[in-house]
């Protein structure tokens, strides 16, 4: 159950391996959180010129991923993830998904720690779903039911999952029998304030004041179903906060697109206060420590030479400026005035960063 990135990827591969598959999706369309994500996919091709140039490798990806999670991850699972990541990219390309050429598209995604992110040609996560749905629409024995909320995992007398109970669009009961098992791919719960607050062990507050980048359907339905069966959960308190986005809505819309290497974070005093290429939790904690937990993201015309370049939501930098969601200036002094920060500290921050 679940028609997001994980659910549809599982459905496609299960069908490729010979299984008859039905995906249940409670929303009116597929996509989940994946379609709202930036779309970048971290993977190392050991033989590529880019990986060699950046001194990257699968083992380095493994080391960074394990240490970046404070060694709480299962080493075997982490190694499985990173060692199969490039095969995953190739699998997606075989399905028809397009990625930018590595020389133009390999970059460091926020919190990614190294330039190994592959950027799709299509915006956000739309490229994934075009590939998945093109496959599903052109193959037998794999279907998607929309507006169908899974409510219970059915088990046989031996405790094996044998189907799913669901509620259809009109409130009707839908029973699906499964001979080979049930894949639960509907566990995201960032849009469920009660659930995330209950599991939270890391942050001071994850209540209503903290908005979510997730879609409205990320309410942890799969977790609730598995709880009824006595499933064992691990590390549920490791909830990620992203140091970006609209604090009023949580949306990433309105952000000027930027690479880790070409931006600096500036607080209300005009100071750069954190390594923008670091871990997401480190950046978020640093942001919370600033006045009003407020920052500007500063970049120059090397990133936006004309102002007509579009972000993942189709918005140009000029449009964001016109809407009052961004400012631009020809000099740092003028920019400081528009940001309402001291010019001398902003100039010092920019000149201190530029040699890097």
What are these regions (language model features)?
Residues 6, 29, 271:
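Conserved Rossmann-like nucleotide-cofactor binding loop
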Residues 83-174, 192-195, 246, 356:
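Conserved redox-cofactor binding core of oxidoreductases
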Residues 219, 223-225, 231-341, 345:
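An anion/pyrophosphate-binding glycine-rich loop and adjacent beta-alpha core
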